[in-house]
Amino acid sequence: MIQQESRLVVADNSGAKEALCIRVLGGTRRRYASVGDIIVVSVKSVIPSSDIKKGAVSKAVIVRTKKEVRRPDGSYIRFDDNACVLLNAAGDIRGSRIFGPVARELRGTNMKIVSLAPEVL
């Protein structure tokens, strides 16, 4: 459950370490985003000598949330952190690696993220 001003870990090797959610996409009154949703983020911290700069605005897809997500079989999945993967203007992921596990809910729309992830829960 991510909303404006939520801080997220960036789970790819694009060069960004932390991002701040500045908008949840998908409607004018939409307040929260969950796993698989696309948000607009501002990069808050980067690794030295990275292509991405601090303050850069980018779209991102959420891959992990602390708030549990209910599955159709009645089970729940939750993670230890809130994490996202940065996207470019075309909607493809910016990095070439994904760090940490990702949720199975990404299979429908983000197969590239699922194929690069070390573990899908």
Curated annotation (Swiss-Prot):
Which InterPro entries does the UniProt record give? Ribosomal_uL14, Ribosomal_uL14_bac-type, Ribosomal_uL14_CS, Ribosomal_uL14_sf
Q: Which UniProt keywords apply?
A: Ribonucleoprotein, Ribosomal protein, RNA-binding, rRNA-binding
Q: Name one GO biological process term.
A: translation
Database matches in Pfam families: Ribosomal_L14 (PF00238)
SMART domains associated with the record: Ribosomal_L14
Single annotated GO MF: structural constituent of ribosome
Q: Which GO terms describe its cellular component?
A: cytosolic large ribosomal subunit
Against CDD domains, the record matches this protein to: Ribosomal_uL14
Q: Which domain of life is it from?
A: Bacteria
Any idea what job this protein has?
Binds to 23S rRNA. Forms part of two intersubunit bridges in the 70S ribosome.
Database matches in HAMAP family: Ribosomal_uL14
Record note on quaternary structure:
Part of the 50S ribosomal subunit. Forms a cluster with proteins L3 and L19. In the 70S ribosome, L14 and L19 interact and together make contacts with the 16S rRNA in bridges B5 and B8.
Name the chain's protein.
Large ribosomal subunit protein uL14
Q: Which gene encodes it?
A: rplN
